[in-house]
């Protein structure tokens, strides 16, 4: 707790005082969990009413570049970070609190492809943040110029050519997927900040997005 308090107050000077409580007793956790879920659900519900056309700025995150140097996560009202931990409101708050931090604003620019979700501002940002590895990104397509994946993604969306469809596998699933590969092997080829056609890391909440 003391380490977290030191981290938050040193990284975010706007926080003057903070207290942290860890609950490890099962009875107490069961008691507090419903309220925590209510808070998270209210946050997610608020975001579901917001569309990419309603805002002028997206947000980017490069927290994972330590192990995926060419990865840059683009966060929009209709696309969460791959890890599922950062939505558009979270990105906005983090950027305002620490403008020089790993989460930053991205002017969305011109909408180049409404079906696939290509924006000039996102293209320019990923070209810079990926060290020139790629210069185009489709925010809502798994083909041609798909969004890169780090390694922290909640799940993988993968193409199944035999039925011309997509499957989704959660990172906690330990069995084989319908294509005969477990999550661990699929993650190895999907991660690393590469654009891999037909295989994208994603947040589970993204399934609710109209752009999915």
Task: Specify the residue positions occupied by each region the protein language model found.
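Cysteine-centered metal-binding/redox modules
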Residues: 1-212
């Amino acid at each position: 707790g003391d380490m977290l308090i030191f981290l938050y107050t040193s990284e975010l000077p706007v926080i003057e005082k903070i207290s942290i409580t860890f609950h490890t007793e099962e009875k107490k956790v069961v008691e507090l969990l419903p309220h925590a879920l209510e808070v998270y659900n209210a946050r997610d519900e608020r975001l579901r009413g917001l569309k990419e056309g309603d805002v002028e700025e997206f947000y980017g995150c490069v927290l994972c570049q330590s192990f995926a140097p060419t990865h840059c996560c683009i966060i929009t009202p209709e696309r969460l970070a791959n890890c599922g931990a950062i939505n558009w409101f979270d990105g906005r708050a983090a950027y305002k609190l620490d403008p020089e931090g790993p989460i930053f604003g991205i002017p969305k620019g011109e909408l180049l492809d409404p079906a696939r979700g290509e924006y000039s501002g996102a293209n320019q940002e990923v070209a810079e943040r990926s060290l020139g590895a790629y210069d185009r990104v489709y925010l809502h397509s798994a083909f041609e110029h798909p969004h890169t994946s780090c390694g922290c993604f909640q799940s993988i969306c993968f193409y199944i050519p035999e039925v011309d469809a997509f499957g989704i596998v959660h990172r906690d699933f330990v069995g084989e997927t319908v294509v005969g590969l477990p999550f661990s092997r699929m993650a190895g080829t999907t991660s690393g900040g590469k654009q891999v056609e037909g295989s994208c890391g994603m947040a589970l909440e993204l399934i609710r997005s109209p752009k999915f």
